[in-house]
A protein has these predicted regions:
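Short, charge-rich amphipathic alpha-helical segments embedded
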Residues: 76, 82-98
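A cross-kingdom marker of C-terminal helix-rich interaction/assembly modules
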Residues: 1-70, 75, 96-296
Length: 296
């Protein structure tokens, strides 16, 4: 046996087969729609952290799938759905209850699981109960996607066994359908996160409307792109969302405001961008100085 041979390395890769997702770069770019949809809700300071974590879990899932760890990839998709549901669960309740539930979550005390959170939201949540009534097909989709993802996570079917998929008899079989199935769940998960983000506030969609954009410059939020909505949310789901009380109330609250002209709007955007960059650099530099002082 060669001195360079390491059994451990061979064994770790024996039943692992890498996969290539077509046009994978597009998914990373599309996820920026969610990453840049910052919420300015002061009563839920961790909202953006939860949404960004959900996005990171999708990124992890893509990486894991291409490395060949497909069940872990599906697990990360499920986690992404659960995390986006958790912040909606925490946001769609009275302030006094939110504080108590947030402490339970932080301290890893008893906390409802995905299905329990959704059931409670359907019964007691003001925003989600209304969304479910207006967007029933979307919430059916969450249930179906989660159920099917669990089939892979719980290894139901030999196609989800590493030793079967990568057996010499099967290893040369075409993986096209296997990859397509994963991509389908990937895209549906991105869509679910994008819509759950809209249960916090409707600005990613409101600001798609120029009539609102020029009346309400929300420095925290970037609007979803039309292409992103068409691919992941669908125009039909968006149409249903615009029937919700939250969307209508926000829309009516802004449409009566004075409409800015483009020159004023572009100045505000430019001013905020420069201020944001300067503030971010200042915060980074202060952290660096503190870190340097502690280090030395």
């Amino acid at each position: 046996m060669s001195d360079n041979f390491k059994y451990s390395e061979w064994r770790k890769n024996e039943n692992i087969k890498r996969y290539e997702i077509p046009n994978v770069e597009n998914y990373f770019e599309d996820l920026m729609n969610i990453e840049h949809s910052f919420s300015g809700r002061m009563d839920i300071p961790l909202a953006n952290t939860f949404i960004m974590e959900a996005v990171q879990l999708v990124v992890n899932s893509i990486s894991l799938f291409e490395l060949g760890y497909f069940d872990n990839a599906y697990y990360s998709l499920r986690e992404a759905i659960e995390i986006s549901t958790t912040i909606v669960y925490l946001s769609d309740m009275p302030d006094e209850e939110r504080g108590e539930k947030m402490e339970d979550w932080k301290n890893t005390k008893d906390f409802p699981m995905q299905g329990q959170m959704l059931n409670q939201l359907y019964q007691y949540g003001i925003v989600i109960s209304d969304m479910k009534e207006k967007m029933e097909s979307f919430f059916d989709e969450i249930k179906n996607v989660s159920k099917k993802i669990n089939k892979c996570i719980h290894k139901q079917g030999l196609r989800f066994f590493y030793v079967s998929r990568n057996h010499p008899i099967n290893i040369k079989k075409d993986d096209k359908v296997f990859i397509e199935n994963y991509v389908d769940f990937l895209e549906k998960t991105i869509g679910i996160i994008a819509v759950m983000r809209l249960a916090i506030d409707p600005y990613p969609v409101l600001l798609m409307d120029e009539e609102i954009l020029l009346r309400c410059f929300d420095s925290m939020t970037e609007a979803y792109k039309n292409e992103f909505v068409e691919k992941y949310i669908t125009n039909e789901t968006l149409k249903d969302y615009k029937k919700t009380e939250m969307y209508i109330n926000y829309y009516n609250g802004h449409i009566t405001e004075e409409k800015k002209n483009y020159a004023v709007f572009e100045y505000q955007v430019s001013f905020f961008a420069n201020t944001f960059v300067q503030s971010a650099f200042s915060n980074w530099y202060c952290c660096y100085i503190l870190w340097s002082e502690k280090r030395h």
